């Protein structure tokens, strides 16, 4: 099969478009002929080399993918050859206490497709059948791949962990990334009022086009927490979605008393200082999560395929141009998701 892989960690130059053996499905697995894959910042982190990451080289990037089942392993009864599917990249073992209590994103032997398991920058991939969602006949593969990881991540964080409710005000820090564009739509779907803080006027305008009510340009408002206080009549917001990390100090300031800070990542940096006095004096909660449960994935994909949530695709590259796609992602030029077209 054709694939894009790397044989050593490094910059985009280590990515190689080449032939690689097509995998064969084991018991409980299916082989998918992929039609689309979607990029995540994790792809670049893995390519560069996480400290302590353990994976088999050569490695294939890619958590998100959608396509058609072309072969079945033994003991697969819920799907058939020809089914159109999208992949849930959140791999639990299916056996531990967390998986058995339907908290598979907390699995004791948790893996993410494309991180420690060869992923979707390829013509074919094998995955357990429990990781699949069956797509309607005409639903677009690229939209499916663009939705899978970011929508389940944002849904689990905002709905199941954060408890965002209609009438609340949610501030989303950053305009452009896949999780944040999903978060804007999910917050609006839930009936919340949305403030987006960003530094790019074009991306802020695009955020408004998908539902943002108030835009704050942090390149003009260095202390944007004050701008949020003014916008909320000195009350503060109920919820801040902050996946940057280094912006936590201002996010804590922007929250009302009893507010919640939700986080699923740290695109800025993993280590930074915060003032604990804001947390205990304002009765704040910091709520982290990773990915979602299988039930959350099905729930949010139901909303996607019925058009209640609409994935934003920034640009599509041919598979062989994955390096250029990653460079665009890393430069932060995208609004929404970048996808790969797989022949």
Model-flagged regions — what are they?
Residues 1, 170, 308-312, 324-343:
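C-terminal capping/lid region of NAD(P)-dependent oxidoreductase domains
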Residues 21-37, 50-100, 126, 136-138:
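Glycine-rich beta-strand-centered segment in the early N-terminal region that forms part
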Residues 91-174:
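NAD(P)H dinucleotide-binding glycine-rich loop of Rossmann-like/cofactor-binding domains
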Residues 153, 178-179, 247:
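Hydrophobic/small residue at the entry helix of a nucleotide-binding pocket
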Residues 172, 188-247:
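Adenosine-nucleotide cofactor-binding segment
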Residues 174-175, 266:
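NAD(P)H cofactor-binding loop motif with strongest signal on the N-terminal glycine-rich segment
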Residues 198-199, 243-312, 341-343:
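Glycine-rich phosphate-binding loop and adjacent beta-alpha segment
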